[in-house]
A protein has these predicted regions:
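Extracytoplasmic "Venus flytrap"/periplasmic binding protein-like
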Residues: 59-123, 154, 159, 251-252, ...
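Conserved N-terminal structural module of periplasmic/extracytoplasmic solute-binding proteins
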Residues: 2-7, 11, 16-100, 279-282, ...
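Long, aromatic- and glycine/proline-rich binding clefts that accommodate carbohydrate-like moieties
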Residues: 325-381, 405-407
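A structural signal for short loop-to-beta-strand junctions that line the ligand-binding cleft
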Residues: 79-80, 87-90, 118-151, 181-182, ...
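Hinge/lid segment of periplasmic solute-binding proteins
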Residues: 75, 95-148, 163-169, 177, ...
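Extracytoplasmic/periplasmic substrate-recognition and gating elements
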Residues: 59, 65, 223, 230-233, ...
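Glycine-centered hinge/linker elements that transmit conformational signals in sensory
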Residues: 171-176, 210-237
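Periplasmic solute-binding protein
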Residues: 97-107, 125-163, 169, 186-207, ...
Length: 408
């Protein structure tokens, strides 16, 4: 009797266990299915940009649920956990310049794995160039940024804006006195000095990761730029330079578009113009161009391809870029947006469009990580310590080569 009862209890337990397993399995499949339709996107953008993206991506509900998560340490976090599908995001919205780092880590998927390459022809060529690493496009461009030539109309009238660097130099000589400066910039910061170097056809770093600090063109740029630096304050920090312009102590500057709302809020009638042409070369000052857009992690491309494609296609809507231009002065990456009044009526956006004709996409190769410090030290030696340009450039070139070699 006891054996029959025990046998019956064991049978019931087995049935219960199997049923529980089946229920658990069904529940697990539901979770997995739901997870396939949830996309987490990391970003580091200001609220105005994030709100436009969020509003557009909410249109994908209920098919796709997008979690837009602001991450202040985005780049370092991706280096640490980008290969862990349990911790990493599915996509991230950021500038193009870290593409090479993450591609070499093996954590990125080419955009063309999901969107056919021919459909990307709607984007400006230089935005796609910025998004390309070793022949693969790893970013869907959304908007871009360049530095701008800005001036305070209280001092510099529209018809006085220098067309060439020699005109700018003359203006600086005539208007630099008594605590006022005709022109200021972060002259010893690589991101700003790059415009002068590029304008001389020099280079900080080539597309293949080779530094060009000791080239004839780069040395010529540093020597020419030095005479402008001599008419600027020695302090080159962001806060100091921008405060001089914002407070009306500097008549003009080269700065990012993010400065415009600040100086307007301060009551300035600010103008933006094309970069002055360098008399020595016939090229305008040609700053770096940073392209902001969406990137796809390999794990998401493999396991959530349908949801990822829907997100990408949502962000390919030109209205997103137009809305970003209106909300935050972002310059659209799509050519067609420049046919729309909402874009062409924005002088800051159109000034970036003009500057982009000659801007150089910031290098996206991993070697660029070591160049910022090397070039910063070079600029300090030349501009602030008065060291010989040629000798300093050659020493910086050797340092860069050694640091790059240690990376490989």
């Amino acid at each position: 009797m006891r054996k029959k009862v025990r046998s019956k209890l064991m049978s019931m337990a087995l049935v219960f266990t199997m049923a529980a397993g089946l229920l658990s399995g069904c529940g697990g499949n539901n979770v997995a299915e739901a997870d396939k339709n949830t996309i987490t996107i990391w970003h580091d953008k200001e609220d105005a940009v994030a709100e436009v993206l969020q509003k557009k991506l909410e249109e994908l509900e209920p098919d796709v649920h997008v979690v837009l998560e602001k991450k202040s340490d985005l780049t370092e976090s991706l280096k640490m956990i980008g290969s862990d599908p349990k911790a990493a995001p599915d996509m991230y919205f950021f500038a193009h310049d870290k593409i090479g780092v993450y591609a070499e880590m093996g954590i990125l998927a080419p955009i063309t794995d999901i969107i056919p390459k021919e459909e990307l022809d709607v984007y400006m060529d230089n935005t796609l160039e910025a998004a390309t690493y070793k022949g693969e496009i790893y970013q869907l461009p959304v908007y871009y940024e360049t530095l701008l030539f800005m001036y305070n109309r209280r001092y510099m009238k529209d018809d006085e804006v220098p067309k060439t660097t020699e005109e700018l130099y003359q203006y600086m000589q005539d208007n630099t006195a008594g605590g006022h400066y005709g022109f200021v910039e972060q002259h010893s910061t690589p991101y700003y000095a790059a415009g002068w170097i590029n304008g001389f056809d020099g280079t900080i770093l080539s597309d293949d990761g080779t530094p060009g600090l000791d080239s004839e063109e780069t040395i010529a740029a540093l020597k020419y730029h030095k005479k402008f630096v001599d008419l600027m304050p020695g302090e080159t920090e962001y806060a100091t330079v921008n405060t001089l312009f914002k407070e009306g102590m500097a008549h003009s500057t080269i700065a990012g578009p993010w400065l415009v709302p600040t100086v307007r809020a301060n009551g300035m009638d600010v103008g933006v113009a094309s970069m002055p042409v360098i008399d020595e070369t016939g090229n305008p000052i040609s700053p770096y161009m940073g392209v902001q857009g969406i990137h796809v992690l390999k794990n998401a491309a493999e396991n959530k391809k349908s949801a990822v494609e829907k997100v990408l296609r949502a962000l390919m809507d030109p209205e997103v870029e137009v809305d970003l231009a209106k909300a935050s002065g972002c310059a659209p990456a799509m050519e067609s947006c420049y046919e729309m009044d909402e874009v062409t009526s924005d002088e800051v956006v159109m000034a970036m469009r003009d500057t982009a004709e000659h801007a150089i996409p910031m290098p996206n190769v991993p070697e660029m990580d070591v160049m910022w410090t090397v070039v910063g030290n070079l600029l300090t030696d030349v501009n602030m310590s008065g060291k010989d340009v040629t000798e300093s450039a050659k020493a910086a070139q050797q340092e860069a080569l050694q640091l790059i070699e240690s990376m490989r």
